[in-house]
Amino acid sequence: MILENFKRESLIPLPVTFISTTSKDGIRNIAPYSCVMPVLRPFDLICVASAKMRDTVVNIKDTGEFVINMPGVEMVDKVIPTASHVPFDVNEFELADLKERPSKKVKAPGIEGCYAWMECKLHNIYEDEYEGFPYLLILGKVVHLEVNDDIYNPEDGSWDIEKANPLMMVESDRGMHFCTVSDINKFEPYGAMFPDGKDPLAWMYEKRETRE
């Protein structure tokens, strides 16, 4: 079946994240974002694609900070309230009945009830326009990363996907279909991709762990 080119997003399962920011006047904002991806490995950069006219974008430009919050499926009912178009001076934590979680390295608070939090400083913004529609790619540098203890194994860096139950989404002509992921019990080391069986980036992980 041949599809229209723009429907490529319908075939890619996307994470659902909540990005929390604070305006320069201290107003709290939350918005759901799915076009979010880490930039390679083991960098500490993360990329967010956004329409230009968003309160989140204004706050990130003004303050240079934001938090990417990772919710489980139990928070699916918070997506629409935080996506609603409301006046700039509305506190969306109160609107969505969400509790603030104090951040360690940025002023913007995280969101209680999520399973992971990425506190970010603005690294760069790339602005462009496509067919008359302005958009941005926001690059953030993760300055503090935290995850619930009960889902993460510090011994090998793995995490319990089924316990975290990450909220995800696929799109269709009618709207958003929310879903999650499951473990298929298959594992391969990074080195399996290379002829000598060694991960050429292993030294970078060791260097970072030593530095931290």
From Swiss-Prot:
InterPro entries: Flavin_Rdtase-like_dom, Split_barrel_FMN-bd. Keywords: Flavoprotein, FMN. GO terms for molecular function: FMN binding. The keyword Flavoprotein applies. Its cofactor is FMN. SMART domains: Flavin_Reduct. Belongs to the flavoredoxin family. This is Uncharacterized protein MTH_574. The lineage of its organism: Archaea, Methanobacteriati, Methanobacteriota, Methanomada group, Methanobacteria.
